[in-house]
Amino acid sequence: SYTDWFPAPIKPERFYGEKIFNYIQPRAVHRNSPLVPYMPSSPYFGDRANESEQGDVHAWSFFGRHPKTKFKFVYELEAFDRIPARFSSEYGFFGAQMESTVRRYLDGTEMRFDNPIWKHHGEFDRKRSNIDGAIDRHLTEFKTLDEHGYLLYSGIMQGLLYAELAEAMRRKPYGAGDLIWMYNDC
């Protein structure tokens, strides 16, 4: 099922986590807690990786124009309740780095949106368009923000979206939990 994660041109012949998920972890769980059942998680459980009806999902796949959720954008708060997952083992929302981190790697150069050093450290176009769209939709007009304001509002927006998605997962009567993936590191 792990092959569902990769487009055809880059599908690996083997996914190297297989031994950990199917041999090492089950033995470790059984040795330390013989009465606790072990169930491998995505991508090694179920008929296909990210199958929402069984096992866990990486909820990133539900962002975009997914047929079940009808998300239009990654930042559409009102669609989070429609994620059909029992457990999300990975999800998140793009966020900019903290200003102290940005200033550290800029090493005295000017903090500007078009600074190539800033872009090199993770401010790529798709990430920026998601952040900008979320700020525009939920907080203020992105175009009115300077670099400092962008970093501040990006963090606020990321926190709001994480909170909303965590609450949406928590409200499910059959929900078993979720794990947030931080996506604002270098």
At which residue positions do the language-model features occur?
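Active-site neighborhood of glycoside hydrolase catalytic domains
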Residues: 1-54, 160
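Substrate-binding clefts and catalytic carboxylate motifs of secreted carbohydrate-active enzymes
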Residues: 27-30, 39-42, 46-52, 66-186
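Low-complexity repetitive segments in secreted/extracellular proteins
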Residues: 56-58
